[in-house]
Structure formats: C-alpha cells, structure tokens
From Swiss-Prot:
Catalyzed reactions: tRNA(Thr) + L-threonine + ATP = L-threonyl-tRNA(Thr) + AMP + diphosphate + H(+)
SUPFAM superfamilies per record: Class II aaRS ABD-related, Class II aaRS and biotin synthetases, TGS-like, ThrRS/AlaRS common domain
Subunit and partners: Homodimer.
Function of the molecule: Catalyzes the attachment of threonine to tRNA(Thr) in a two-step reaction: L-threonine is first activated by ATP to form Thr-AMP and then transferred to the acceptor end of tRNA(Thr). Also edits incorrectly charged L-seryl-tRNA(Thr).
PROSITE patterns in UniProt: AA_TRNA_LIGASE_II, TGS
Uppermost EC category: ligase
Name of the protein in its database record: Threonine--tRNA ligase
TGS domain location: 1-64
Phylogenetic classification of the source organism: Bacteria, Pseudomonadati, Pseudomonadota, Alphaproteobacteria, Hyphomicrobiales
Name of the gene this protein is made from: thrS
Region (Catalytic): 245-553
InterPro entries registered for this protein in UniProt: aa-tRNA-synt_IIb, aa-tRNA-synth_II, aa-tRNA-synth_II/BPL/LPL, Anticodon-bd, Anticodon-bd_dom_sf, Beta-grasp_dom_sf, TGS, TGS-like
An annotated Gene Ontology molecular function: metal ion binding
Length: 668
C-alpha cells in the first residue's frame, strides 16, 4: 500500500494524506468548523460517506449549503421515518424508501394502513430520533448473515431484497443507534444532521414492486429541506399550486372536462377550445415564413412503425387497431387484416413526406411543421388533467438539412423558442445539452460531430443571452438516436417545466433510406432535427392556466370582456359598447340581468373574465365606460372610443403587434 495519497482540492491545490485517511480526517485537517459542518465528501464527483477512506483524486467537502446535501438530507430523513414507524408500531415491516423530487417516501407492510392522523405522531418521534444525534455507521455483511438477521426480525421484504442483489456485490448495512437498514448509501454523519426542516405530507397505498399482483403496502410521503425557510417556501408553493390547479380552474372557467369513457382525452368546451385555437393560431403565424405546414395520417400500418423502430422500442406505449369487420368476419378473404397503430409521434410521417420526390441540396433546409394529434398509452394512475394525457397535439417540426447547416438551424430554432416563451411571459429559461447515452445508434464519429456542433451552439446561446439564459450539460441523457437540447421554463411560483426540445436524429433517415442529391450528384443522408416548442399543446395550455392562475393575458383569454349594466336604462348603451368592442375584434358577452352590479362582478371574477365594463345611467349620458380589471380594486373611467382602442391593442397578439409596429416604423 502506498505511504500517502494525493488529493486535489477545488482551488487546484494538492495535498498529501496518509493511506487510510477518511473524509472526516481531511475535513478536520482544514478546520474544525468545516469538519463540524461537513455532511459528506465527493471523490471525483462521486458522493461518499465522511467515514470512507479516501483515494487519490479530486475531493470536495460537502456541507448543508451544497445542493448535493439535499438528497442526503432526504435520504436520511426516510431512514429516520422508518425507525420512528417501527418504534411506534412494532412488527411493521420496512420495504424501500427512496428519495424523489422534492422529498422522499417509504413503503411499509402494516396490518392496518396509516391514516393522516398518524403523521403528527410520526413527526414527533422523528424529532426525538434526530435529537439523539445517533451516528450513521456502515457495515458490510455477507448475504447469509443479512438473510438470517432480517428473517429473524420478520423482515420478509428485506430478505427478498437481499436475494435480488447480484452475487459478488457488497451488502451494506447502515446503523443509526440500535436501528439498522439495508442501504447502498451514502449517508450523513448522524441523525442530527437531518435537521427539523421536514414535514410528512400524505399517506397512500402502493403495491410491492409496483405490481398489482403483489401485496398492497402503506406509503408515507415526506419532504425535507436544508433549512426552515426553504421548507416554508416549498409549502407556500404547494398551497399556491393547489389554488392554481388547472383542473380546478378548468371547471370554474368552463374550459374542459374528462370522463371515464375517454380516459386521458380532453372534452374541450367552447371557451377552452377558443384558448386552444388562439394558441395554435399564434404558433401557426410564427411558423408561416420558414416552415411548410403538413399533415401526416393518424393511423398507419404497423409495418411502418417496425421500420421506424417504434414498434420494437415503444410498442407498450402505442394503441393498435384493426378493422371491426376483419375481426368479426375472419372468413372474408377480401378483408384488410392488417394491424394499424395510432401514431405516437409525427416524425415517421414527415420522413415519408420528405422522401416523396427527389430532393436536391439546393432545396435544403426543408422544414416541415405539423400540429399533429398523437396518442400514447399512459397508465390510468398516471393521468393528470391536461399535463398527462393519452391523446394530445404536438407542435412538431422536422428540419432536413445538410451537416453544414445544422448549427445555423439549431440557433434559428433557439431564437424561435425563446421568442415564443417571452411572448407568454416566461423570462427564466434553462437550456441543457443531453449527450450520448451508453446504448445508442450511429458511429462515434457522428456523435462527436453532432455534440461538437451543439456544444458550440450552446456557448453561442449563452453568449447572446448576456446571462439571461442559463445553460448546462446532461451527460448520458441524450436519446439513443442523437443528442438534444432541452428547454425548461420557470413559472410564476418557481416550478420548472421542461417544454421545448431540439433533437438531432441519426436513426430515422437511415432506417427509411431518406436522401438528397448533393453537389457531387451523390445520394447523401440528410441531418434530421426534431423540434418542439410547446411540446404538448394541451400541457402547455395547462401550464399557462396555472402560471397565470387562470388570469390569462387578454389576447389568449377565451372571453375577453363582459359588459354589465347597473340599470336597465343603460342596456341600450351597453349593447352599443359591446358591438363596438366586437367590431374591434374582441370576444364580448353582455350581462343585463336584474342583479346588483357587485354580484355580477364577483360572479365573472370567479370565471376569470379579465375585463368587466360597467355601464350605468351616468356612463350612457357621458358616453364613457367604467373599466374593472380582474384582481384589481381600481376602477378606470374612459371615453368609449379610447377604451375600445386601448382594449383592442391589448387584445392583439404580441407577434401581430410587432409586425404592425415594424410596418409603421418603415413607413415613418
């Protein structure tokens, strides 16, 4: 064994330590305060226990301020919760307890399932365990010992987990005082480092290993954060998210509904369909100059999906259909017995359109766009309003270009995506490049070239944004058929939504034999770029509803203005106001009911009407209007003509407004 090991620190300095030194030893050599605040170490990027011996490499000391500490806090909180449950209900079996987004859960085998009333008791016991500050210590057990000990404790699920661990792999046991669990780790130094910024959120049922043929377990979800302020912010965000839930607002605003006969497909009501069409119309205008809109069939022979690879890679997520006649009349030799599939993606259809007719390099790039209805199977339990459906519309486009055109096309797509997001009020955008996964098609040379181009594009995006756009790399997260950019936007309450993608595809052009004639009169395979901006139009609409809490921008709102009268004497003038607004292009309804004006205003506010114009005897005499805005107590009095002009301008989509302003500037 070497007499010394050499560690490189984040500042570039290199120090030697005796062989056998642990992460804690390294932290203590720097300062006692660092050793006290340290929760783990990272060697060459891999997070490890503080008690682990270190080897040559790059070392980082992880404290609670480090983003990586959050996963450790949540992981340890799950273990503390499991110990608390077994102290409160002896005989309960623990199964698995992973970290998930924003928290953790643990599944338990218990005779009687947990109820929400149990959660405060468990939280109290967890705080007791945390206060004990018991150290986390790691042991390596043999398979035989682990099975024997867990079997003796009646932990049958743990025995099954031990059996599932591959032979030759270490079996790690982590102790926290007298309690222990089978776990890969890593963990922090002690239960005390979990802190008290946690909350148990809910109970649920879950099948063992997610299989409905297995036993039903009792699951407890929790969340944990580095400090109380972060926990409070998260809980506030959840409360806001509940108020903004698009399913609730969709009912209140009479936009859409779902029902059992069509699980995961939307029944659009008139107002909801208006929003959807406004979104499609806007996107269609943005594509009018550079793209050719096409439409590929929704139902295609599975032979095509076999060629594309979807039938092999994606079959479980597809809907297959066969004619009822062929199924009920097998004796009919003329019947079409083929199996067809509803398209889950638009790309194979677009390749067929590209292939139809010889293409020259002079015609490239060819950009094909479609608002294509696609269908993908999702388990019933995964369906979630507009956010997770089985039938949805993709704002899909596919660009066929030369290798040399790839960078320019990616930048052009980026400009369009960012401009669209900005028009909808999204300012905080993150663009990340996902690179080659282990399992992939295409040669290393192809990947090298594509990743080099996209890395340069990412640098250009960052430079052009002057810091407004954050960028990053997701190693190994690319699709099997090519690297991609992922666009994530942040909404009004801080949630992140991954929407846009720019995806290079080495697979489909080769599978379908797509080519163009290059400058040497040779057949050459084009570069194919998949592009989506909203992604699922339904999901994007759901994001908009939640981002604006139903108070959509006037140009997207399905009902833009309600004209309400105070007295029947103003009804004739109210009709005149409504007609003037309609002539200016606004969606308007009138409310001349014999109800008090405050009642009318409250009622229309619930349905999120953005503008209510109130007309009484005074307004009729003076030919003015009283404007009330959703969410504001202010009342603005304006002349009718000025009000119509102002609201018409506000209701003009931003892209149309820009064109008008540019035309005006040219004429000046």
């Amino acid at each position: 064994m070497s007499e010394a090991i050499f560690l490189t620190f984040p500042d570039g300095s290199v120090r030697s330590f005796p062989a056998g030194a642990t992460g804690r030893d390294v932290a203590e050599s720097i300062s006692k305060s660092l050793a006290k605040s340290a929760v783990a170490i990272a060697i060459d990027g891999t997070v490890q226990d503080l008690s682990d011996t270190v080897a040559d490499g790059k070392i980082e000391i992880i404290t609670r301020k480090d983003g990586r500490a959050l996963e450790l806090i949540r992981h340890d909180a799950a273990h503390v919760m499991a110990e608390a449950v077994q102290e409160l209900w002896p005989g309960t079996q623990v199964t698995i307890g992973p970290v998930i987004e924003n928290g953790f859960y643990y599944d338990f085998a218990k005779n009687e399932p947990f109820t929400p009333d149990d959660l405060p008791k468990i939280e109290k016991k967890m705080k007791e365990i945390i206060a004990r500050n018991a150290p986390f210590t790691k042991q390596i057990w043999s398979r035989e010992k682990a099975k024997e000990v867990f079997a003796a404790k009646g932990e049958n699920y743990k025995v099954e987990l031990v059996d599932a661990i591959p032979a030759g792999q270490d079996l790690k046991i982590y102790n926290q005082g007298d309690w222990f669990d089978l776990c890969r780790g890593p963990h922090m130094a002690s239960t005390g480092q979990v802190g008290t910024a946690f909350k148990l959120m809910k109970v649920a049922g879950a099948y063992w290993r997610g299989d409905s043929n297995n036993a039903m377990l009792s699951r407890i979800y929790g969340t944990a954060w580095a400090d109380q302020a972060d926990l409070d912010n998260y809980l506030h965000m959840l409360a806001e998210a509940e108020k903004r839930d698009h399913r609730k607002l969709g009912r209140e605003m009479d936009l859409f509904h779902f029902q059992e006969e069509g699980p995961g497909v939307v029944f659009w009501h008139g107002k909801g369909w208006r929003i959807f069409q406004a979104l499609v119309s806007y996107m269609r205008r943005r594509l009018a100059v550079d793209y050719e809109e096409v439409n590929a069939p929704q139902v295609l022979d599975t032979a095509l999906w076999e060629t594309s690879g979807h039938w092999g890679w994606y079959q479980e997520n597809m809907f297959a259909v066969k004619s009822a006649h062929a199924m009920t009349h097998p004796e009919d030799k003329e019947a079409d017995n083929r199996v067809f599939a509803l398209k889950p993606m638009n790309c194979p259809g677009h390749v067929q359109i590209f292939k139809h007719g010889l293409k020259s390099y002079r015609e490239l790039p060819i950009r094909l766009a479609e608002f294509g209805l696609v269908h993908r199977y999702e388990p019933s339990g995964a369906l979630h309003g507009l956010m997770r459906v089985r039938g949805f519309t993709q704002d899909d486009a596919h660009i066929f270009c030369t290798d040399e055109q790839m960078a320019a096309e990616c930048l052009k797509i980026n400009d369009l995506i960012l401009s669209v997001y900005e028009d909808f009020g999204f300012k905080e955008i993150v663009v990340k490049l996902s690179t080659r996964p282990e399992k992939r098609v295409g040669s290393d040379a192809l990947w090298d070239r594509a990743e080099a181009v996209m890395t340069d594009v990412l640098k250009t995006i960052e430079a052009q944004s002057e810091g407004r756009i954050k960028t990053g790399i997701l190693p190994g997260e690319g699709a099997f058929y090519g690297p991609k950019f992922e666009y994530t936007l942040k909404d009004a309450i801080g949630r992140e939504w991954q929407c846009g993608t720019t995806q290079v595809d080495f697979n489909l052009p080769e599978r379908f034999g797509a080519f163009y004639i290059d400058s040497n009169s040779e057949k050459t395979q084009p570069v194919m770029i998949h592009r989506a901006i909203c992604g699922s139009m339904e999901r994007f609409l759901g994001i908009l509803i939640e981002n604006f809490a139903g108070h959509l921008p006037l140009w997207v709102s399905p009902l833009q203005v309600v004209v309400a009268t105070i007295t029947s004497e103003a009804d004739a003038y109210g009709l005149e106001v409504a007609e003037a607004l309609r002539e200016a292009g606004l969606n308007v309804e009138t409310d001349f009911r014999n109800e008090k004006i405050n009642y009318k205003v409250r009622e229309h506010s619930v349905t999120k009407v953005p503008v209510i114009i109130v007309c009484g005897r005074k307004e009729a005499e003076e030919r003015t209007v009283n404007i009330r805005r959703l969410g504001s107590q202010d009342q603005v009095s304006m002349g009718l003509d000025a009000a119509v002009d102002s609201l018409a301008l506000e209701a003009t989509p931003p892209d149309v407004r820009r064109k008008a302003e540019a035309k005006k500037a040219r004429a000046a």
